[in-house]
Amino acid sequence: MKIGIIGAMEPEVAHLIAAMTNASSQTIAGIEFIAGTLAGKDVVVTRSGIGKVAASIATTLLIEKYAPDAVINTGSAGGFVDSLSIGDIVISSEVRHHDVDVTAFGYEIGQMAQQPAAFIPAPYLVEAANKAIKQLGEVKAIEGLICTGDSFICDPVRTKTMLEHFPTMAACEMEGAAIAQVCHQFGVPFVVIRSLSDNANNDSPVDFDSYIVKAGYHSALMVMLLLEQLDPNSVK
């Protein structure tokens, strides 16, 4: 079993890379891919860069060059659930674009033309994540809708509009749906694991800078615990 792990920023992958053994590195199109062992599994970890285009490029290269059995997207997100605090975790129940609108042609808001409205993670990866939750201690984790767009959300007016479009949204970020869409195209199972760095409000820029390291650590810890729960025979 080989697992691809994608984070956008250095704090989102640093703890994973530090915990790897037998690591080797290759750079393709300016993106570093580090192959090795983590939590007893063969993994390839990469820092994609921020945003949907960067994430799509990294995911495509990862799948084409390394042929992972599954892909995990890790990192930070803005939170939309009152019961969650900064540092808590959202596991994707589904992933959608929040900044796509081709409704004029009969598609749902957030649905890219010729694509599903929502990208659904592999049940066995979500199951492994839920098992890992029990080992997180004081960190709270839930399953929920994660939405993606090429904007850092810190405007209450925009937050209100997003919640009108996606009332069950638990978190938003800038890469997950792009990674999910590429995985969908290639038929590769995926899951998105995000730790909250802010609450998508006026304080978000300050909160993000203050808490990105904490969010990156919690998300990385969750990924490592998830890897420990994975049964090589469960890949499907």
Swiss-Prot record:
One of its GO terms (cellular component) is cytosol. GO terms for biological process: L-methionine salvage from methylthioadenosine; L-methionine salvage from S-adenosylmethionine; nucleoside catabolic process. InterPro entries: MTA_SAH_Nsdase, Nucleoside_phosphorylase_d, Nucleoside_phosphorylase_sf. It catalyses: S-adenosyl-L-homocysteine + H2O = S-(5-deoxy-D-ribos-5-yl)-L-homocysteine + adenine; S-methyl-5'-thioadenosine + H2O = 5-(methylsulfanyl)-D-ribose + adenine; 5'-deoxyadenosine + H2O = 5-deoxy-D-ribose + adenine. The active site is at E12 (proton acceptor), D198 (proton donor). Belongs to the PNP/UDP phosphorylase family. MtnN subfamily. This is 5'-methylthioadenosine/S-adenosylhomocysteine nucleosidase. It comes from Shewanella sp. (strain MR-4). The lineage of its organism: Bacteria, Pseudomonadati, Pseudomonadota, Gammaproteobacteria, Alteromonadales.
